[in-house]
């Protein structure tokens, strides 16, 4: 395993220069990153042709984080609509495990992030979210992606983690999903990673987090785990247009709905069952290190796992697998 390196991400800087130091740190690997991203886009050539004809799609007024995407586009030598579609592709390829586990009087938060994209391990980074010279939150992400899928807020002590969900609405080809996501983006629905970023960087209190995660229109169905170290954690099951379920117990979430065994994406059922078995074996004298090591075994950590993060008693532990 490899330690995750954190970089300062200053929101007070012009959006077009926020990523400069981070890209500079990876200057010797940018060509490699571009090659991987181009290969990732190849199966979506049809989507790219459609997007290239949608002039309004790259209108700065329609694009959140336009300045950042503009800079990333220039550094990678790619077209802007290619970078934009990458933001959407990531939302329909991630399989993850998130869990909130009672350990005595405390809670442990577990998160693994799984993608069938081995190259992401070399480009996974942490960001210290800075505003007014103060660290207001953190996220684990990768170069080229401007949303947050795993992030935590310091002021209000909560963490948000997103898991991919394959709802009835999303039982269609990947091309159809992407085109649908493009349509929703143009009509200003929220990419879920952008929604999480909005909550974290604007230091929204938990009441706003509950409202946003349950009420806003999203471009993709998902599961949203909100871990509150000193309060009531919860998991929201979302379709694009509505909340399907919200629960405050049994907080183990993989990539199938609570109480169901299908779709069994990347050992979703086995991951859930394994975490349940670990919870059942917890003793009052178990150490955090031992518990984390026990949790981070197959199938929770598997061939597609990119990184993991655990939070316990105010400390955050994380590594690239």
Curated annotation (Swiss-Prot):
Molecular function via GO: fatty acid amide hydrolase activity
Which Gene Ontology BP terms does the record give? fatty acid metabolic process
Q: Which organism is it from?
A: Acanthamoeba polyphaga mimivirus
Q: What is the lineage of its organism?
A: Viruses, Varidnaviria, Bamfordvirae, Nucleocytoviricota, Megaviricetes
Identify this protein by name: Uncharacterized protein R632
